[in-house]
Amino acid sequence: MTEQETLALLEVKRSDSPEKSSPQALVPNGRQPEGEGGAESPGAESLRVGSSAGSPTAIEGAEDGLDSTVSEAATLPWGTGPQPSAPFPDPPGWRDIEPEPPESEPLTKLEELPEDDANLLPEKAARAFVPIDLQCIERQPQEDLIVRCEAGEGECRTFMPPRVTHPDPTERKWAEAVVRPPGCSCGGCGSCGDREWLRAVASVGAALILFPCLLYGAYAFLPFDVPRLPTMSSRLIYTLRCGVFATFPIVLGILVYGLSLLCFSALRPFGEPRREVEIHRRYVAQSVQLFILYFFNLAVLSTYLPQDTLKLLPLLTGLFAVSRLIYWLTFAVGRSFRGFGYGLTFLPLLSMLMWNLYYMFVVEPERMLTATESRLDYPDHARSASDYRPRPWG
């Protein structure tokens, strides 16, 4: 730009700054802004005077630069508002307009909150923090489960969450494993339970049939005799000595139970029980209980048996030991026919109890609570016991 163009621009800026009272619109190239009375602005007159001395090309370049400068000056921020020296004129008829009442602005969040909560975080900062609801952490009580009954079928169903009602394939397998016991292929219809019940009953029935047969066969065909035991004390001592052999399966079970505790690292007394350890523990506990009941009745039976039938004492002792070993084996395998081994122990115990009660109340009631010798061991009393049976009614 030449010196004349620079001077023209400075004069335009000086003249526009005090006279601008409203934002000016953009003026296209080649047009001049018109005033209210149609008179041109003094800045434009000076521009024309200054540019008339130059060449035509310079005049056209000056006009283009002036138009672009005026358009840029109209968009500047300091020219958009009214200047304090030139107040904005009031529009005509503004006094006829009634002022509208000011709308009540809604209270902000900080104004609505009480004074105690005035030190809360701002809204934007509070979005970064997620409040913790204790009700979401606590487990829902059992009373919250919704139980509905279908009107048609009349069956009550407990509605569970959708994740439980439609489990994943892995969860479905676990659910089926819990509902259906291992080795059950009936699909949960209940036929496997009936089969297990039938097997248990059949095994106990087989023990009921074989128990007297085994006892009679051993009594008749085993070649050994019992020594002469005329006194009650000698019979009790003989019975207790026979009971030592019956403790063999119990002691063996205790040893295996201790080894299982060491092998499976289940030394914690209140830890989670394991199947390999619980099998032997239950066997030992049950065997000790049956041993006490079995030999208590066997000792009482030895005081009532005649001399010829004292051979039953060692036979019943051996039957107890064998039956306990059979039960232990079948219980460890997990078969339902373990009732056979249990029946070989419980049925002789029940038979001895019935025999003792029969002798105490029917055959020899006078010796129920005394320690006298049995009259069945003497030759003169070798006759039938019915000849000497006292009647309670006389």
Curated annotation (Swiss-Prot):
It is a multi-pass membrane protein. The chain crosses the membrane at residues 204-224, 244-264, 283-303, 313-333, 343-363. It comes from the Eukaryota. Residues 1-107 are annotated as: Disordered. One of its GO terms (molecular function) is identical protein binding. GO terms for biological process: cornification; cuticle development; epithelial cell maturation; establishment of skin barrier; hair follicle morphogenesis; positive regulation of epidermis development; regulated exocytosis. One of its GO terms (cellular component) is lysosomal membrane. Residues 1-203, 265-282, 334-342 are cytoplasmic. PANTHER family: TRANSMEMBRANE PROTEIN 79. Contributes to the epidermal integrity and skin barrier function. Plays a role in the lamellar granule (LG) secretory system and in the stratum corneum (SC) epithelial cell formation. It is linked to Defects in TMEM79 may be associated with susceptibility to atopic dermatitis. Atopic dermatitis is a complex, inflammatory disease with multiple alleles at several loci thought to be involved in the pathogenesis. It commonly begins in infancy or early childhood and is characterized by a chronic relapsing form of skin inflammation, a disturbance of epidermal barrier function that culminates in dry skin, and IgE-mediated sensitization to food and environmental allergens. It is manifested by lichenification, excoriation, and crusting, mainly on the flexural surfaces of the elbow and knee. This is Transmembrane protein 79.
